[in-house]
Amino acid sequence: MPTILDEIVATKRVEIREAKVRTPESEVRAAMESAPPVRDFFAAVSRPGAVRLIAEVKKASPSKGLLRADFDPAEIARTYERHGASAISVLTDERYFQGSLENLRRVRRAVGVPVLRKEFILDPYQVLEARAAGADAVLLIAECLDDRALAELYQSIRALGMTALVELYDPENLPRVLAIGARLIGINNRDLRSFQTDLEHSLRMRRQVPADRALVSESGIRTRADVDRLAAAGVQAMLVGESLVVRPDIGAAVDELLGNA
């Protein structure tokens, strides 16, 4: 039986074909010439010390629907940065998450920290789109990609000077992710097949990831106690969105998570 991830990937392949017709690759490459310089996403989220926050600009999700009605991506991103986020993640999927590349462009202009394009990346064309929109990093999801595509997309991202955040859920995918040389590895605590979350998943996986690779824990992080557990396990960064954007006072939510006075 097809999962929500299967459905999203099938939809995305159609969207990519349509995008290539609407905006040929030559036009995307031309737009890259005027894109802002790349900021060092890897350095921002892997600095020694506290667990670094990658705060996500997220309007909706397939499981929860609309998360925030008064959604202003640039203002949310500025709030995140002002309260201590080390980087910003922007969802660009339109159908399932109500995101857009325009949101990414707006966020990139609004903040001084590095910005990640969070998307179901299946084609090098999307990597070019990301850079043209000002992205400093791009997410790759191992569960969506075979070995060849994973390696090709990783190299495409690196060739443009951006950071690849390579995400996995299934531990069986870890050898594949390590084989391409990924330095920044995301552990999704949400099973993309069932959409259930389990923070323990990151803690278990930290023991399997080599110490010279930086680890990002993604999904299901809600409290300062959760952050303390990640820190104790040696996790470098966390990607948090839903538990922040649903709060009336986003800045206060970030302060609580980071333990700001």
Regions found by a protein language model. Name each.
Residues 204-208, 231, 246-261:
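C-terminal helical cap(s) of enzyme catalytic domains, especially alpha/beta-barrels
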Residues 129-149, 186-195, 235-254:
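Glycine-rich phosphate-binding active-site loops on the catalytic face of alpha/beta enzymes
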Residues 11, 58-60, 93, 120-121, ...:
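Active-site beta-loop-alpha junctions enriched in small/polar residues
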Residues 52, 57, 64-165, 171-176, ...:
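N-terminal active-site wall of soluble small-molecule enzyme domains
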Residues 2-70:
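An N-cap/entry alpha-helix motif that binds or orients negatively charged groups
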Residues 184-240:
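Catalytic-face loop-and-helix region of soluble metabolic enzyme cores
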Residues 6, 86, 136, 183, ...:
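Receiver (REC) domain switch/active-site residues of two-component response regulators
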Residues 122-133, 169-180, 217, 221-240, ...:
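Catalytic cores of alpha/beta
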